[in-house]
Amino acid sequence: MSVQAYDPLADERTPEGPQFDVFLAGTVFLDIVFTGLPAMPAAGTEIWAEGMGSCPGGIANLAIATSRLGLRTSLAAAFGDDDYGDFCWRTLEEQESVDLSRSRRFEHWHSPVTVSMAVDRDRSMVTHGHPAPMPASEMIGSPPRSKAVIVTLSPDEPLDTPGSTCNWAELAHRNGALIFADVGWDPSGRWPRSVLEQLGRCHAFMPNATEAMAYTRTDTPRDALYAIADKVPVAVVTDGANGAMAIDSTTGEEAFVPAPRVTALDPTGAGDVFGAGFVLGTLSKWPLSDRLAFAGACAALAVQQFGGSLAAPGWGDIADWWHEVREAAGHSGAYGSSLARRYAFLDRLVPTVPVGAVRRAVATIARYADVGGSPQPATQPATQPTTQPAAQQATQPASQASGEQPATKPSTATPEDEDPNTPRVPAQKE
């Protein structure tokens, strides 16, 4: 596992503290994202996309987002024994510094795959996969010590139910971890209120406005926020381009922060990036308004990139954005001045040391791919990214990865290239 270039919690760490900042569990998908489509293809027709990107998806969206912000992240997930599984494992562990000690490789089980097609700032998806051969609770066993865990609440498997796939979060909570929770879309339309009964064990709940209003049976995001705040110490409701609002009963704070104005290209994973930013702010003990502002800025940076999980910003991206905002404040009107005042706290946070550029999604599954670099022969080690000041970092959007830039050669790696210590578990027979 590579070493993170910047640690925003360095001053908070003690020798006896938890090994990890965040522990996660879930399903990792291989995401293939097509961009620049003029329209969805009609039946019996074929169209060409202007660009494409391949990257780990699912719970990997959140793992990469937290790790890129400098949070020491551990992930428990099942990985297939196919090339897609190799790619996702390698990307998470070697490229994104995510600990996979609680993850497992399973023989004869293929990786779940999602194909996402972006049209007019919206997206449609097709997914295929099978349940993991082993429940998360069995794969994890005793979770590692962490400052926080992030879970998705489910009406079918509540946090405190014995045998639930989420009971690992309860074990982590007993060992001192704060539980940050979100919730998924309910395709049944039932939106059972029993989900909210699980909030008594959570530190924070971070649904979007649609989900919050549906579960609380309210008509406005603010009414939903107040209803949630009666059940959990920290209530957060995100509202897309409108911003986010929150109540922290542990500090007595209430805040609303508008989102920065950006041209959104791909909303994939924006909620995960927001959550990662909010968790960092909470662990750093920032004021509530700063937590919301930082999380909103991270999400705004992510939606300007194609490529799912690898669109998540790193500290170099945040530093570059803040420097641009600060320099433009004097000649960009009231909005620019307001933005600079709102984010002035970043002056004490952005790295003062060089940090490496984060990587964006490449078009195809490639073993050697780097920002501004070229693939190395299979007999030589991959060139490490050059460390440079944040303002000089380059990125490679997914739309450039298939056509506008020289194509990366496909992997020619042999089985000897794989880590022999990677745990592999035989699949359970049906």
Please place each PLM-identified region on the residue numbering.
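Ribokinase/PfkB-type carbohydrate-kinase core domain
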Residues: 1-30, 89-105, 117-256, 286, ...
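Substrate-binding N-lobe of the ribokinase-like
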Residues: 5, 9, 22, 42-113, ...
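A structural motif shared across PLP-dependent enzymes of the aminotransferase-like
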Residues: 31-35, 55-56
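Short, flexible, mixed-charge acidic loops at enzyme active sites
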Residues: 34-42
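Short, small-residue alpha-helix embedded
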Residues: 63-65, 71, 213-214, 265-292, ...
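Short arginine-rich
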Residues: 301-310
